Amino acid sequence: MDAFKLLTRSTKLKSATTQSSTLPSTGKAANPQLFRGAAAEKLEKGSGKKRKRAHAADDEAVVNEDALNLDFFSQGRSSIPKSSDAATTKGSGAPAGQEGASESDSDADDEPMDEVQRRTILNAHKIKVTDMRDLEELAPAQVQSEEPKKKKKRKQQEEAEKQQPQTLSKKEQKKARRLFPQPLVSFKELRSKYKISRRLAENIAEQGFTVPTEVQLGSLPLLLGNSAVPGGSSDSTSATEPDLLVVAPTGSGKTLSFMIPVINKIVRHHHTHPEERGIFAVVVAPTKELASQIVNEGRKLALGTGVKVTLMKKGMRVVERENEDEDVLDESNSESSESESDERTPNNKNKGPVPITKSDILVSTPLQLVNALSDNKTKPLATLPLVRNLVLDEADVLLDPLFRDQTLDIWRSCTHPELRASLWSATMGSSIEDMAKTTIKERKLSLPQTKSYPLLRLVVGLKDSAIPNIKHKLVYAATEQGKLLGLRQLIHPTAATTSDVRLRPPFLIFTQTIPRAIALHSELLYDIPPEAGGSARIAVLHSDLSDTQRSDIMKGFRKGEIWILVTTDLLARGVDFRGINGVVNYDIPNSPAVYVHRVGRTGRAGREGGVAVTYYTKEDIPYVKSIANIIDVSEKLRGENGERSVQKWLLDALPDLSKKNKKELKKHGVKARQTGLKGATDEKEQRRTRISTKSGFDRRKEYNKKMMIAASQKKTQARKNGADSDSAGDDDDEDGWNGLDD
């Protein structure tokens, strides 16, 4: 019985358990866009008035129509016009005649936006497109067009002309690099304006995609090749697909953004070159779970288009080598024993008779693809001459020291002169951007026939920041036991105050290491009552498990059979669980970027109500400030004036972390929780950070029992060894030297 309810039954206080029904698990968000508000409507009205003054009354109808299209993005407009909504949601269910009529109407209505409209939409959705090429490569006319048009005296104009060839200021450089390409207003434009495959457009509609997210709004027109990208001259209107760096929030639809252009490009290539078959696109992801997810999403989009999407697996052949069949025959002839031939039978099937993988899009992790190209590093790296698109998902991890060499080897193996590279992530530092520019330049020098394309960067929102549609909580727990009690309080909430954090399953729990994940799983194994499913509702996932076990756990979590999943940073990136209500950082992340990706597992596609809880102890205090800063920026971006989870006094009190300690934290995590520590003080730290609620007395009893069993086994083994040595000694005495014979 709740005493608070009993004592307040005659009052009109609101129940503390009443929560808004908006949770990520309740369903799809009405609008998946993260950045939308009243500011967009004001800018759109201003642009409409500008067009009215510029044009005569005959353009008034066009202005009103454009205003309606722009109002499509505003928050005040709760719904899309019924005609467009019906056409979008029905998708392929509409008859062919009606679809063709709607397409012809949309062709007639599609008109290119002027720069004011493009700027309005892109700024309202916090989309920034920048040309990353050197200033020497940019058109001088572009620089001049960005200068403010003001009346100047002749002397000032002459001075400005003299200073023009010299180095520009930072502000002028930013203006020269800034671009405002045509945005994607709705997914219907993919078919009407950008002429994508009819079947691909139907598949997109069947998936229920109606409103493009910010990253789709900005990147799809660029990658589909129908948006004019500045080239070498100001009058160049030839549309070209650029190399692209994309920094967009987690759960914003980056997979769809790079899969649609790749599939459409391959469909066109199949029509123009039906005899040419092979791997035309390579998608690289850091984990098997993310690679498998990309394959599933790609197959949904490519259904019925003739494009095959394949997941790279061990033993697959992706290239054909010279004299490969002869090598296999020599190996088979050199073995003669029956047992060895029986063991070699599956290997022969994989090496000799197995044909080259017939796929258009290959999705792989870096190591598997490098091993396939180099025959497990026994031969020189083979080339992929037909690959025209290279996609690096979670590019900041792929170009980190852990995967950097393998990723660059894959990049160099793609030798097609028209190769386009696109890098995607929610966090991307300047070092990653510089590495991408350097790699593109080196590839151009090593392959003279390589064509040069613009290198653009698209940033959505604030760079390297957490999504604003989730609630962040930073909780001080003092000790490991305090964190465990706080976690159990989340699973079994009993408090009646409205300020308490409430988290409904399903949710993820992140730990620093695999042993800690296993220990936490065993500690929470029986916290869920049998009536609710018991221990089957909680699972642990880490890289030490087999591929089959990992796949089964992922399926169970997606189906809703598993409610709580304890894991490491294996699931921190890219994996899309759309119904997760929250994330618990049981151990603080190793870097701010890891925090952004961890909490991004909830609040996918604009879903509201997600919660991110981070526990920290006394040992974590030196490392918490960077996380607190991210939470503070995210809450400011959200724009609410309520109580903040990170107060100003806390930000001022937390210590700053040096660069050396940041690198150490990123590599090894918090020292107190590292595995394999040696020394008396380190052992003491490990005992302090142990995940357990057992008392020291119980642990000592268990330890003594284990030692007694080990000592007994040792004695038994010693007795056996002694008996064997005695019998061996007797035999030696019988066979030994018995003296000289008489």
Swiss-Prot record:
Acidic residues bias spans: 102-113, 322-341, 727-742
Similarity comment text for this entry: Belongs to the DEAD box helicase family. DDX52/ROK1 subfamily.
Localization per Swiss-Prot or TrEMBL: Nucleus, Nucleolus
Organism annotation: Emericella nidulans (strain FGSC A4 / ATCC 38163 / CBS 112.46 / NRRL 194 / M139)
Reaction it catalyzes: ATP + H2O = ADP + phosphate + H(+)
Subunit annotation: Interacts with the U3 snoRNA and is associated with the 90S and 40S pre-ribosomes.
Molecular function (Gene Ontology), one example: RNA binding
Enzyme class: hydrolase
Bias (Polar residues) ranges: 8-25, 75-91
Annotated protein name in UniProt: ATP-dependent RNA helicase rok1
Segments carrying motif DEAD box: 393-396
Protein purpose: ATP-dependent RNA helicase involved in 40S ribosomal subunit biogenesis. Required for the processing and cleavage of 35S pre-rRNA at sites A0, A1, and A2, leading to mature 18S rRNA.
Keywords, ordered alphabetically: ATP-binding, Helicase, Hydrolase, Nucleotide-binding, Nucleus, Ribosome biogenesis, RNA-binding, rRNA processing
Domain notes for this protein: The Q motif is unique to and characteristic of the DEAD box family of RNA helicases and controls ATP binding and hydrolysis.
Amino acids binding ATP: 248-255
GO biological process, one term: maturation of SSU-rRNA
Ranges annotated as biased composition (Basic and acidic residues): 696-705
Helicase ATP-binding domain sequence ranges: 235-446
